[in-house]
Amino acid sequence: MNGVATKSALNLARSLYEAGIKNEGVLKALADTPREMFLDAALGHKAYENTALPIGQGQTISQPYIVARMTELLLENAPKRVLEIGTGSGYQAAILAKLVPELCTVERIKSLQIQARLRLKRLDLHNISFKYGDGWKGWANKGPFDSIMVTAAASTIPEALLTQLADKGVLVIPVGDESQQLLKVVRHGDTFSSEVVEMVRFVPLVNGELA
């Protein structure tokens, strides 16, 4: 299904529209991306359910609504270069790569990164740079970034990510431990504004690398 929407994917996109996702580019990207490719075969039948699913190593592929919502927020300033923290399965990266000119993505778990790279190559997505490393540190020599998305919950907003955000740039990040808030942070020169978008539930953003 490379670029061709299946009935299940179209139904998912339709349900996301009804749930409040209005960006047509985001909806099309989700409809055109085979979510089952990013899951273990045993979970393939759940690919188009609006739910988070396990991908191994204690990580998950996010609920499609959250993928779409975070992508909408990130696109508000029409970013050219985007940083994703937490490649995971590669599903969110696939959506972003269809919508922005340049995507840089960081993953701390080597086995997940290897699998994600293979999947994204099979989808013929070539505007992605990959880094194996600590997401808390971002990717300084690729910055500054017009937008940054974090796909795991940080206890606090990592200072390195604020530093790597361009002026007028947007950072979309879940913050908190037990109770987590999805924040949209905007840089204004040397200051930052933030707003709470909604309550969310993510795996934690962990320091360091894991082979």
Swiss-Prot record:
| One GO term describing the cellular component | cytoplasm
| Principal location | cytoplasm
Instruction: Give its localization.
Output: Cytoplasm
State the CDD domains in the record.
AdoMet_MTases
Highest taxon in the source lineage: Bacteria
Q: Might you give the EC number(s) for this enzyme?
A: 2.1.1.77
Cross-referenced Pfam families: PCMT (PF01135)
Reactions catalysed, semicolon-separated, are:
[protein]-L-isoaspartate + S-adenosyl-L-methionine = [protein]-L-isoaspartate alpha-methyl ester + S-adenosyl-L-homocysteine
SUPFAM superfamilies reported in the protein's UniProt record: S-adenosyl-L-methionine-dependent methyltransferases
- PROSITE patterns recorded for this chain? PCMT
Q: Which family does it belong to?
A: Belongs to the methyltransferase superfamily. L-isoaspartyl/D-aspartyl protein methyltransferase family.
Instruction: Tell me the protein's name.
Output: Protein-L-isoaspartate O-methyltransferase 1
Q: What is the organism field in this record?
A: Shewanella sediminis (strain HAW-EB3)
